[in-house]
Curated annotation (Swiss-Prot):
Top-level taxon of origin: Bacteria
Pfam families in UniProt: Trm112p
Cellular component, GO annotation: cytosol
Name the record gives this protein: UPF0434 protein Avin_14770
Amino acid sequence: MDPKLLDILACPICKGPLKLTDDKSELICKADALAFPVRDGIPVMLESEARTLNVDERLDK
């Protein structure tokens, strides 16, 4: 995924910042505790496609 794209993307729910996971498979919104998938380098920014972060992921800094 292009780093410039990450600079302009925001969470579709709270409009907060997103963080790309180390394996580049998800975009994380800590505020909403959601992980949006990245498929073939394309972020899927639909709430219905996001998964809820588990407790350990929520506490991970």
